[in-house]
Amino acid sequence: MSISSRAISFGSPLLRRLVFVAVLLLCVTGSANDKNNKESSAEVKFSAHTELVMVPVVVTDKSGAHVNGLKKEDFTVLENGSERPIATFEEIASQPERLIRRPTPNMFTNDVTSSGRSTRRITLIVLDALNTPFLDQTYARNQLLKYLSQSLDRHEPTGLFLLDRRGIHVVHHFTSDPQVLIAALHKVMGEPLQGSDSPGDLALATGTTNPIGSQTGGVSGMAGSPAVPTTALMSAVSSEAAAFQTLVQDSALNFESFQQRVAITYTLDALQQVARAVGGVPGRKALIWAGGGFPFSVSDNTMGLAPAGRDTLSDVLPMYEHTWELLNEAQIALYPVDVKGVQPNMPNASDDLSTSPGTTGFNNYLRSTSYRQLDTQSTFESFAAATGGRAYFNSNDLVEGFRDAVQDSEQYYMIGYYLDRSNTKTGWRKLAVKVKRDHVQVRARSGFFVTNATVNPEINHDSDVATALKSPLDYTGMSLAAHWDDVVAGKEAGKKSVRFIVHVDPDPSLIDTTDDNHLVLEFVATATTPTGEKAGEPTGKKFDMHPKPDALATIKEKGISYRGALELAPGEYNVRIVVRDGLSGRIGSVAAPLKVD
């Protein structure tokens, strides 16, 4: 589900709340609950492919130093409490090697190479302006600049992204020189999420003022009108005032749920795009998420997505579970950093916040703010543990979190085992890694989702392709290159047919040898103007084939190419080319700027 950010920024604050009540109520339906219940009780329908689960494992001593020399026999992997045989094992000591794109005129590629062997270390940083108060955004940028200027290795592959209400943006690509990143950070300007309105609106929404009278409890009408001290009239006015106040509070809660749904969708979408951008690069990646908190809560035991106020979010669950799938496939460890710094003491159960008349709504607001802070910390910790990272909050020194994220990826173990296919129950599978060594600390992701949406790539086909086409990031699920070919007269007057060729590098994993060498590749290309408007019609083709021996040998040796064309009028365009593997769901994409004379 994708909702335009413009939908939450028009009109007066109170009008916005009231208008979107109806929209929100349409989003929250009983049928969504029914679908979710059916999905929870359904069995997983595995394909014929074996599922290799890769788990990066960080093992340190009490001082935090990496423990070297462990063997495969020293490790035990448990899935839902049952031991699984380790199929692959490797100890990795990574070096800060620059990732470099291969520059060639009129050649656009998503392939990245390193100076030596395949790079197994990337640090990614997301500044979350969508879910972060404006003042805290400035603090986060200053802390990040402090880390980059003092600690960053100039060879360390580092990517910086900004998330705001327009989506995810690339500030610095991980193939670029990290020195450029320091200069670029000075130019990053955060944009806060549409938040609290005027003090009067906040008071109205939280019940700190009487919406039709004074706060003194007197009854008044228009300015200058005397109070009418009749019991019946006072009772009627009080009743209407209470009803109206309830309506306003109800509308505010409904709008807050709607606004939260938008933030959840944008946040999950950003996580998916970042995971896709590094999914084709081997090794563990550290993702530092610097923000004021995720816009959702999760359960520690099931990692299920908790309701957002009155919104059950049932229809968002597939997107949430798919996000986990992509994070795990990309071997991303999440390091959430709460940029709000040290927080003041929060109210507890012993605090008396309910005795003063007229303060009920405000006290509820204080309580909800405090619990949101606790919720932020809990969700950050859950996400960090589930991915093998660490969470940092309630600190005025964020540099530690940035530094630890890089250090954890310097040395680690990569363990692989095959998924337990005898368990066909959908849901969260707990994962535990144990080491037969005393006085060591082991950190690995604590689980993963197994649902039909995660094992059947076709379920997310449409949303995956649509996101890839609009994303500013090149996806690296498969290595590809594209170039512009010749230009001929178009079928429509005033337009030209611009031909292009896309080449997918040889990749044995694209071919299913157990199904008569089955190969499924889908090519799609779209063009937009510099302002983001659609230009012309998308073009593409899907290949679903079982190549004969001669053709198969050529594909294995040289890869496979596709020739397409876009019908465009003269002008400048941003073209996005996407290639999707229909068997695994992997995606490769590349941007190819174009000027048509």
What is the predicted function of each stretch?
Residues 1-15:
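N-terminal secretory signal peptides that target proteins for export/translocation
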Residues 17-28:
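Bacterial N-terminal signal peptides
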Residues 31-597:
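Scaffold/interface architecture of coatomer-like assemblies
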Residues 6, 25, 213-216:
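N-terminal start and proteolytic maturation junction detector
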